[in-house]
């Protein structure tokens, strides 16, 4: 049987995600971000709600990406997620993309010339941002051009790099309907961005979300809910360079900007430069919010939920892969668990995220 991996945020889960799961074959394993997203923002609803949405709509097994995999630039996010899925035995990786290319060929190219390609990136001027350097590399070696508004295509290339040299086939699916950042309501498939923006529009949600009741019952948060706490973390820390990935230049800019910024968005605007993209700045602010430090990734994989089919697969992995299904006195990953505690501060109604929580079981698919 085919074992298909899907890397996702489901922020929130919508019909486009359901379409992706429907297109996937065999046993479907999702490696999903926890409570903080790749672009450096809190998830609109918590990881358990999003895992349940996925399991109700075609996923067989949902595992959690640790915080230091979830909140990373595309390459590191892709690498960390593929590492986890590879250990769970996938032989195919399905993903949505704005531009269906021969990603397998691109992965083979990276297998062959990876060292040379990375050297090329290292020699590019530091005035370029990391995404610009990566795009220059793909243009040079694979003749790829970028239109600028194709975040899924950029992630797909990160997945191609991550599967290079592994026995995993890439299976791109053409993204349906609205673009990633689109807030357009008049489409067949709405984007997660549009759903977050129109979260109070009942008819809109019902049109584009398969598990709308779960979404409506869940506590919802936005970055601004954490702004007072972020502000406190910045003001009370005498040396921001002790935080993961924060350099001297960024520390100075953030300290200066917090004097006048009245919101997270304003702070991001003030700190962003040509070299430091908004997404990168948001990630740095997320690290500051968590007081994140460089940390070893957990050996074990945290299981958020499964169907009967997923449970059977986990049983077959026993003894080969270290799995965590309940977090007790011993932490699974201290950094992720700290992030979850801070996530809970966003709204008093958010349920406990770890202790006593057991995987969600969905009996029928």
Swiss-Prot record:
It catalyses: cytidine(34) in elongator tRNA(Met) + acetate + ATP = N(4)-acetylcytidine(34) in elongator tRNA(Met) + AMP + diphosphate. The keyword Ubl conjugation does not apply. This is tRNA(Met) cytidine acetate ligase. GO terms for biological process: tRNA modification. Signal peptide: none annotated. It comes from Streptococcus pneumoniae (strain Taiwan19F-14). The lineage of its organism: Bacteria, Bacillati, Bacillota, Bacilli, Lactobacillales. Keywords: ATP-binding, Cytoplasm, Ligase, Nucleotide-binding, RNA-binding, tRNA processing, tRNA-binding. ATP binds at residues 7-20, 96, 152, 175. InterPro entries: Rossmann-like_a/b/a_fold (IPR014729), tRNA(Met)_cyd_acetate_ligase (IPR008513).
